[in-house]
Amino acid sequence: MIKNREIEVAPPRRTIQFGGYTFVEPDLNFKAPIFSCCGSIRDPSCEEREEEYIDNGHDEEPPVEVNRIQESTSFDEPVSSPPRYRPSENPGPSSSSYEPGHYSFNEYQQFPSRPQKRLVDPPIVDLDEEPPIVDLDDSFDNFHVGSTSEEVVSGDIAPEEEEEEGHDSFDDFESVPAQPPSKNTLASLQKSDSEIALNQQRHDMHGRFRGFLQDDSEEFSDEVGLLGADMNKELYDTLKSKFGFNQFRHRQKQCILSTLMGHDTFVLMPTGAGKSLCYQLPAVILPGVTVVVSPLRSLIEDQKMKMKELGIGCEALTADLGAPAQEKIYAELGSGNPSIKLLYVTPEKISASGRLNSVFFDLHRRGLLARFVIDEAHCVSQWGHDFRPDYTKLSSLREKYANPPVPIIALTATATPKIVTDARDHLKMQNSKLFISSFVRDNLKYDLIPKAARSLINVVEKMKQLYPGKSGIVYCLSRKECETVQMMLTKAGLSAEVYHAGLNDNLRVSVQRSWIANKFDVICATIAFGMGIDKPDVRFVIHYSLPKSIEGYYQETGRAGRDGMPSYCLMLYSYHDSIRLRRMIEEGNTTTGVRSMHLNNVLQVVAYCENVSVCRRKMLVEHFGEVYDEQSCRNSKTPCDICERQRKNAEAIRLFDVSTDALSILKCLPRMQKATLKYISELYRGALIKKSQEQAMRLGHTKLPFYSKGQGMSEQDALRFVRKLVIEGYIHERLYSVPNQAAAVFAYAELTEAGRDLANGKKTAKVYLHIVTCERKRKNAGLIELSNMNIVSEAQALKERHMVKHGDVFTRCLQDLTHLITAVAESSGLSGPYSIVSREGIEQIAALLPRTNSDLLRIDSMTQIKVTKYGRLIMELLATYWKQVDEREEEEMRNQLDKLKSGEIVMGGFATLQSDPGFPSVPYMKPLGGGGGCRGRGKKRAFSGFSSGRATKKPRATAPSARGKTSGRGGAKPATSLKRNMYPATSM
């Protein structure tokens, strides 16, 4: 037992670099803490303190207290936990009897006694066979899919190695070593160039934000000078006495100083970084009432309870509050010196309640309206993943309370530069001070595996081993899916409950509080759950379905590991989930601009999932404008699955130039009406399924120029290639529905305007595809075919793209860079600039404008020695061009915002499907969104559309639903028997 009641972390000591090693200057006054055996009896003086802490990689102010001793810091070691109530009949091992051991993702075999075929690609219906039927109601909550086929097919994402039977891909993900390797081995003394580049003194932009967002923290670094000694002392005294903290963390101090000085303040911090303190502490110190606008009643209730526990006057005016309670709050607000320091309200309450606005006017007149706080400020922007119309009405707060102006604080954890700009414009706080914390969550491991029949069960078994008795979240797309997953988890031996909008308010609150109190393990929820939840020990977050946006995914995964301990974030990826999301978007009544934005968000998530080469942490972080060196992830204890594979084998992935084949497909696509992506990929490989072979030959599709060009690709590679054309914007999958069949949806490939321009020669472009070339089961013939394709370097591929996008910047930068390197060569007595960097290398630098050491190291002829020697000079020169590019992209971003507001952006739309010779005429087929069908209880008839030209089949009868007629689109009743998945897009 540690005798010290409070242990303070010593400031970091000075380090000395020598060669490839780092030495720490010893502390001559070091005193070892006193330890003694306590006979397993807990000393009451060593009570744990609940304090959230997140390691965000670049924080300037580490916490000054060690609040608790954690059980594990590695994915290899199971985390022990206190006993908890477990309603499940098959509870996991308790912490009392559990002996920590070493668990590796490679060592643990799932279900060793039951070998099974692994579904890399979940079987779904393809229009080459028969159209799918999907049943859903207005809210999409009663969606259900029929039994899956037993056919084993390949997925889209090529894993590092194909798994053998009985071995799930999840077992191949390596966990963090429990003990570091011996430092006496030669291997431990050798470092790669990229590792050295990461650890050397940095002159790049790693950990900094691009020019879109300018952090104002430096302006508020001197608290004594800004506040005065007395006010500053009161600030820290209140921090300790009311909130129990000794120091601020992240950007809290600067945000609070800005608020205390009366500035409008915009706070952009990740989940769990302590945003709430930025307005709660000023509310306690300064007189008056702080009005907090929050989107969820559950979130409001949680905050109110916390404040009252801390002895801070706090009330909430919500729709479910009784009249007597409301009268009491209004009376207190009207008193001469209200005891209420924080008043929580919803945006709907502000827009609907005249009495509340009258109270605000009265407080403002008396000088007691301290500030407005807009929590979850991303809800203001239509670009935000959780846009709420009532939030846009909050702009009136600036107009109504302008003399004197009432300060506004806006806070969010998930806002891209575009959302920040839009939100500031909406709230009329363009001149607000901006404070940004790093988006890097070093303790989270990001992972992705194909969504297959037993994927979730295998993952759950692994979580039970790694985190026995610990909490987790499984996010689902619909209410029905939540209930299905909850039953699966219960059967697997985990205690689980559901949380979605279909539950009444009391039940939702009860479920949430029970989960926070550790009365059950896993909560199966829609995205309605989690906002503002203060539970630091969530050990895993699993996305059973595709999230709606990158911002939403980051926010939802951010609910894991808020205590700073290693935690696991996994996505089960199926491409057809994107079609489900698109249907929900395209059925909605939105402007073309908003619809375009939401569709683009889904496409960004698909690109994240289809990616096999770029660090997932880098993709997430840079989505928010922060520059990140992926080598940091690769060297961490929690590398993402991409970096883990790269760490094992840096040559596992090769980049191929597939431009010629892509152009051939685009030219042929207009001749192939009703073609699905899967059918196109089969033609490209020359590997049509048996049922469609005859029709393809009859229609002449086997004579198309691109037929059988991709023989060297696996099925998943070919699918990724075709989907790449969708992601790049050359192909668009248009969704169609059938009158009288509200459940049926079809996705057919069509050329976009950019695709037509490329096919017609009006523009030129390159298309590249990353392929995993080290798979155990890849046939030799396939490797030979791949070897005949053009392999290019990452820098070469990016060079051509950037040269086109910023041609004038490239020209000027190339000239300046050549002059710089020539001068360096002359001063070093070298023959010329190309003795330092090759001509190709100089062009690549000018085109790519690398912002990190690792990016610079990828340049042709660049080595670690050169990065160390010349990196600072190169980065200093590039800084000017970084700024120019950022300014252009910021202007483009503002233009997009303007178009969004006017609805000028049009993506998709609903065109009439033209019949193709050789295909049966279907006069009653309508595009999705073109109107409903007949209402009533008549029998439904499934449309037998297809992509390969087979004859139509007889209509398939569906059993009547026990639920009766729905109130959904077209009044169609959901089918109860489905033998295939729902959409004609192949899933993972």
From Swiss-Prot:
A motif (Nuclear localization signal) lies at residues 939-955. Residues 458-603 form the Helicase C-terminal domain. Its EC number is 5.6.2.4. Residues 46-119, 148-185, 930-988 are annotated as: Disordered. Its main location: nucleus. Disruption phenotype: Reduced viability, increased rad-51 foci in the germline and an increase of meiotic crossover formation in the central region of chromosomes. Reduced number of rmh-1 foci in the pachytene region. In an smc-5 mutant background, defects in diakinetic chiasmata formation, compromised chromosome segregation and aberrant distribution of the condensin II subunit hcp-6 in meiosis. Its cofactor is Zn(2+). InterPro entries: DEAD/DEAH_box_helicase_dom, DNA/RNA_helicase_DEAH_CS, DNA_helicase_ATP-dep_RecQ, Helicase_ATP-bd, Helicase_C-like, HRDC-like_sf, HRDC_dom, HRDC_dom_sf. A motif (DEAH box) lies at residues 375-378. Coiled coil: none annotated. It comes from the Eukaryota. Gene3D superfamilies: HRDC domain, P-loop containing nucleotide triphosphate hydrolases, Winged helix-like DNA-binding domain superfamily/Winged helix DNA-binding domain. GO terms for biological process: chromosome organization; chromosome segregation; determination of adult lifespan; DNA damage checkpoint signaling; DNA replication; double-strand break repair via homologous recombination; meiotic cell cycle; meiotic chromosome separation. Keywords: ATP-binding, Chromosome, DNA damage, DNA repair, DNA replication, DNA-binding, Helicase, Hydrolase, Isomerase, Metal-binding, Nucleotide-binding, Nucleus, Repeat, Zinc. SMART domains: DEXDc (SM00487), HELICc (SM00490), HRDC (SM00341), RQC (SM00956). ATP binds at residues 248-252, 272-276, 562. The record marks 297, 388, 501, 526, 548, 676 as: 3' overhang DNA-binding. It is an enzyme of class 5 (isomerase). Residues 121-138 are annotated as: 2 X 9 AA tandem repeats of [DE]-P-P-I-V-D-L-D-[ED]. Monomer. Homodimer (via N-terminus). Homotetramer (via N-terminus); dimer of dimers. Homohexamer (via N-terminus). Self-association negatively regulates DNA unwinding amplitude and rate. Oligomer forms dissociate into monomer in presence of ATP. Component of the BTR double Holliday Junction dissolution complex composed of at least him-6, top-3, rmh-1 and rmif-2, which is involved in double strand break repair in the germline. May interact with rmh-1; the interaction is required for mutual stability and localization at nuclear foci. Belongs to the helicase family. RecQ subfamily. Component of the BTR double Holliday Junction dissolution complex, which is involved in homologous recombination during meiotic double strand break in the germline. Stabilizes and positively regulates the localization of the BTR double Holliday Junction dissolution complex component rmh-1 at nuclear foci during meiotic recombination. Participates in DNA replication and repair. Exhibits a magnesium-dependent ATP-dependent DNA-helicase activity that unwinds single- and double-stranded DNA in a 3'-5' direction. Negatively regulates sister chromatid exchange (SCE). ATP-dependent DNA helicase that unwinds single- and double-stranded DNA in a 3'-5' direction. Participates in DNA replication and repair. Negatively regulates sister chromatid exchange (SCE). Stimulates DNA 4-way junction branch migration and DNA Holliday junction dissolution. Binds single-stranded DNA (ssDNA), forked duplex DNA and DNA Holliday junction. The N-terminal region mediates dimerization and homooligomerization. Both the helicase ATP-binding domain and the helicase C-terminal domain form intramolecular interactions with the HRDC domain in a ATP-dependent manner. The HRDC domain is required for single-stranded DNA (ssDNA) and DNA Holliday junction binding. This is RecQ-like DNA helicase blm-1.
